[in-house]
Structures are given as C-alpha cells and as structure tokens.
Amino acid sequence: MPTYRSFLSAFVFCTHILWLAFSSALAANDDASIRQELDFNFDWKFSLGEHSGAQVPAFDDSSWRDLRLPHDWSIEAEYSQENTSGATGYLPGGLGWYRKHFATPELANGEVAKTQILFDGIYNHSEVWINGHSLGYRPFGYVAFYYDLTPFLNTDGSDNVIAVHVDRSRYVDSRWYTGSGIYRNVKLVVTGEVHVPIWGTTILTPEVTSERAKVLISTELRNDSEQARVVNVSTTLLDDSGLNIGRDMKRLEIAARSTELLRQEVIVANPQLWDIDNPNLYFAQTEVRSEEQLLDSKSTRLGIRSLRNDAKTGFFLNGRNVKIKGVNLHHDAGLVGAAVPIGVWKRRLEVLKEAGVNAIRTGHKPASKEFIELCDEMGFLVQQETFDEWERPKNKRRNGRHQGEIDYIEQGYSEFFTEWAEKDLTAIIRRDINNPSIFQWSIGNEIEWSYPRYIPATGYFGKNGKSK
C-alpha cells in the first residue's frame, strides 16, 4: 500500500517536472516579461538544530531532510511537561535551517528577471540569505514580507541557494500554540524592470449603491531600468465570468530608478455587491505597455461593498443592518499544527457557516493570506488582529497580566515592538487592504494588560488603512 511519504515524494517530483517545463516555456515566450507569481514551496531542505555556515552556498546539505512547505517542526516533536508551558502546547521550539537550490529566472531576451521572494509567514526570528548575502531579519512570526533577490542572483548558469535560519529558542513566547518554521506559503515573484510592485495596488469603493458604484484604483509603477520609460497603463474591471465591466487607461512617464503612483476610476452600473450571503467578486486587470510591448500584467481581486457603523443601531453592510455573529479562530488546527492545509480551513468555515456564524476574529494575530481569501469567497466578515503585546510583556506561563520578571524563553513581541510595530502593521494592512471580507482592523489584543498607548498606535492606521 502506498505510504504518505511515498505519495509526498511523487507529488514533489511531479511538481519539480512542472517547474522545469515552466522554465522552458518562460524562455520561449515572447511575453515572458509578464509577471509570474510562482509556487516556491517545493524542493526545500531542512535540518533541526544549529549548523555553522549553513548560509554559504557550498555548504553540504545532502543529508538534510527533503520537504515541501508549509512546515511546522514543533508539531512533529514529542509532547513533554519539561517544555514548561501549557500555553504553547508542551512542545519544543529550537533552531532550524531551510535551504533551497534554484535556477536564475530569465526573460525572453535572456536578461535576468526582476526576482523577489515573498514569505507569508515564518515563526519566528527569521534571517534569509541568497548566495551567502543576508537579505534581512524579521522577528514577528505572523507578518508577510519579501526580499529582492535580483542583485545577488548568479548569471553564469550555476544554481542559486536560498537559506533561511529560524530561531524559535524563545519557545514560551506566546499564550497559545504557535508552531515553528516556514509554516505559510512562499512565492517567487518574477517581473520585468518596469512593473507593479508587490502590494502595489490599492482599490477602494467609496460610493456604493445597488444601482451604481465608484471603484478607485491606485497603482504604484516601478521603473528599475537606467532610463526613463513612457508607459500606457490600462485597468479593466472584470466580473467572475470574465465579462468586461469597465476600463480606465492613462499614459505617464516614470523616471529611471523611481516609482510613480497612478490613480484610475471605473464606474460600475448595477454592481453585484459582496455580501455575507452572496460574496460576489470582481478582478481588476492592470496592464502596463510601452508602445505594443506588454511589460507587466497584474490581477487584483476585490469586492464591491459599503461598510458603516452607527453607535445606536450597529453595523451596516451595503446599507443593510447586519448582526455580527462571530467566533475567534487561532491559526493552528490540532494535529496538523500551524501549517494548516487549505482544505482544513474550508471544512471549518463550512461548519461554522452552517451554525450561523458570519464573522471571524483572527485571534490574536494576522491570519494567512489564503485564509483571508477563503473568507472572501465564502462570505465571512473578518476582524484582522495585529499584536498581543506592545511595549510591556505578558506573563505567558500564567497566561495573564504581567507578574514578575520575564525570562529569555518567555520574551515575546514586546521586546521588538518599538522598532518593528509600524513596519509590521504597514505590511499587514498593505497585504490585505483589497480583501472585501476584512471589515475591521484591531490594533492589539488585551493591550490594557501591558501598556495603554492607543493614540500613537492608531496614528499608524492614518497612514495605511484609514479608508478601510
């Protein structure tokens, strides 16, 4: 009888073949400068523990375990009360290394493509290297982030090596089970020099009725070349069947090594509104052209809906008074740990929908992108949470108020809040600003337990998500 491991090996092999086929097609395609957002979860090497020099490309990882992401190494370990904290599941943390070898993506003309790696979440304290060059460090385990690989990619035909170090030695750093490792999806984003940056599109619907809706599209356009470029930018609004609903086109010049912000508007007659009962979705297809050459093409999913709160009568969705019937969902799922298959989330949400639930609070931190997209599709309202700690820590062993000193293994986000909170909050909002399911952002969970500093924190939202 085939085993799970043999099935997984076969799956990984087939995925690798598809990647090779894609690479060949990329080189032969006249429109190869069009963006590709590639599944980068396959063909990773992993080893638990510390390995000196593992960021160096020549490091021998042949004995390391082969795996496909997402991956949570803590759930694979044995439960033990020696791990001291029931809050994090009596499971260990530790140190882990991931490595991946891959070829340099190329455009049709043979030039090296603009290549970025997008992580949806690594728990936690991650540092990423490409070919021995450190790209950066992120302490927060629930935030998406990306790095530009382009300057460090090999151009001589040799493989590149991505190395990721994860430090989960602070294994009592939360009041719930966190997991450890690259537990969310990874993508490789390949574009030309002129492109829409990752999270470079913001779509708002400031005027919505059943007869008419105004859709405002703000698009960042980046020119990484050494010369100015004049481009035509068209954004077409499509319904879920692909029907053209409306279009706006503008022409602009982008100086060398610079970014421009373009604003466009589409009026939609008789819009199909996004609602908890009928979660209708649209797509904004943005194309960037120079003369007849397609430089970039990016699709952004959205929903047309209006949100309003009234202190006396409550919440209104599309002008209709809706009673919020919500639950709190953490990011793990029992025996699969923190690396939750999308099918598990779909089943959970189906059961909750049958029970009459219409809203989810992502306790007590941001959910994965695929979870938010599933809520878009299934008609759930989402309150996206951010942090469980600000500047003062909580005592995780007692799962409550600050009591006594916090030791090393209990150090959580409070140690990094001052330096990282605004950066992380910006990333959280920019990633999810276009998801129609999100109707509220929360700046912190039970923060009165640590330090009441609401005014400066809400100032971050004024720069990022005020209209949301």
Which residue ranges define each predicted feature?
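Hydrophobic beta-strand positions in extracellular immunoglobulin-like domains
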Residues: 46, 102-104, 134, 166, ...
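Bacterial N-terminal signal peptides
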Residues: 9-23
